[in-house]
């Protein structure tokens, strides 16, 4: 199965760094932030910047820029590691062409994390559907036990609400890289993904603030 997948997916990195794919990725990255001088300046020379980026990727001379680090305090305190626009352009193209479809293909339908078309409303609708199904099943079981239909019924049950404490900060780089390599069969994509992970420094901790980081963490949870 892996040989078949490798045969079909071996060209994905090449597709991700096509000029059109990179240009489209840049336009997506600029949405909602064109008011920033740095974004406006980069987009003003979009064609030239995209061409230069593609040439560096083709010839293996591409290097990640330094990160912008800052702290947000709402809804809770988080340290953000922001990727420069040039790097986000490449990473968005890589996510769209390879990482997103490869990593999310194994997720269950109810998983709405970083899923296209699956926002908060989707998650609430699915939770409502599951609660309604649970209520019907419990009521039917109670009616079967007593031999007649019930009017009003209160179904007892539990909902598990949890969070992984310091998940991004505590993830070992080796674990994240292995989780992605298990799902992505394109060697160039795996190599660049590993470089992005290692760029955060140390052996633990994935920077919070990019789509690549989010997809890596979802792959870890799905291991």
Task: Give residue spans per PLM region.
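Short, compositionally biased low-complexity segments
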Residues: 1, 16-32, 64-69, 95-103, ...
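Active-site-flanking structural segment that lines cofactor/substrate pockets
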Residues: 47-77
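Non-catalytic, polymerase-adjacent accessory regions of viral genome-replication enzymes
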Residues: 1-52
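Conserved pre-motif C helix in the palm subdomain of viral-like polymerases
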Residues: 77-108, 168, 202-223
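Non-catalytic, well-ordered alpha-helical scaffold segments
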Residues: 20-23, 47, 51, 87-92, ...
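Long, hydrophobic, well-ordered secondary-structure blocks that form the structural core
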Residues: 112-124
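Conserved polymerase palm-domain catalytic core
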Residues: 56, 130-223
